[in-house]
Amino acid sequence: EQWQPQLHR
């Protein structure tokens, strides 16, 4: 499974 980068700040 691909790890999705966390784009929340």
Swiss-Prot record:
Q: Which subcellular locations apply to this protein?
A: Secreted
Question: What domain of life does the UniProt record list for this protein's source?
Answer: Eukaryota
Modified residues annotated as Pyrrolidone carboxylic acid (Glu) in this record = E1
Q: What is its main location?
A: secreted
Q: Name one GO cellular component term.
A: extracellular region
UniProt keyword list: Pyrrolidone carboxylic acid, Secreted
Q: In which tissues is it expressed?
A: Expressed by the venom gland.
Q: What else is known?
A: Neuropolybin refers to the sequence pEQWQPQLHR, it is synthesized based on the inspiration drawn from the peptide Ppnp7, which contains uncertain residues.
As for what it does, the entry says: Peptide with unknown natural function. Protects against maximum seizures in a pentylenetetrazole (PTZ)-induced epileptic model. Acts in a dose-dependent manner when intracerebroventrically injected into mice and rats, but has no effect when intraperitoneally injected. Since it does not alter the spontaneous behaviors of the animals, neuropolybin could be considered for further research as a potential treatment for seizures.
What is the protein name given in its UniProt record?
Answer: Peptide Ppnp7
**Annotated source species:** Polybia paulista
